[in-house]
Amino acid sequence: GSPMTKDLGITLSSGTTVAKDCLDDLDRGSFPTSTGSLRSFWVAHIDGNRTVIGGGLDCIDVGDRIANSDVVSIKRLVGNSLESKDLVTTRFYLATTTQSAYLFKKGEAIPGTMINPQLWEYQHFIYYLSPNSKNGNPELRKRYLTPGGGSLLIGGAMAEGIEQMRILLGVDDSLVPDGEIDRYVATNNVTGQEWSEG
């Protein structure tokens, strides 16, 4: 499909704003913008001073970061299409037809021009390592997008004792991409073009 760019095939409701959104290095948050396509997958590196290389991710306090580790951001649609009765107030959704897409939260009306749209849950998850507040041991944590507060921390650790998280990304260097990985690179060596192809 086409990249998700605001006003180029996808429209956002007035409710698709969040107070505490997690922005990437290009100041793009959870939702598509008109300044570039949505990154469905992005990884940032936290250096030895617990600073995000390239900027972004201010939603994670410096004291809640583990040095020399990566942060993973994933934006996606979930599972099977839903019925309107199945929507919940703590999530965002994407209504789609063959002609258009509309991002909204429960309680907002879908445009009448969208005949029989399919409804999908839209998610933005952020995974990172953080020191445990009681003993300082590193643990894997997860933040998720909500209509009420933006990027919220899920209570408790997903896994404990993970000292570092480093992601290597496979890059297809073929002139005409063939889907085969030609090399693996660290997150801070991925080019803007490679992120947009990912």
Feature map (PLM): residue ranges:
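N-terminal pilin/flagellin-like segments and related low-complexity appendage regions
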Residues: 1-198
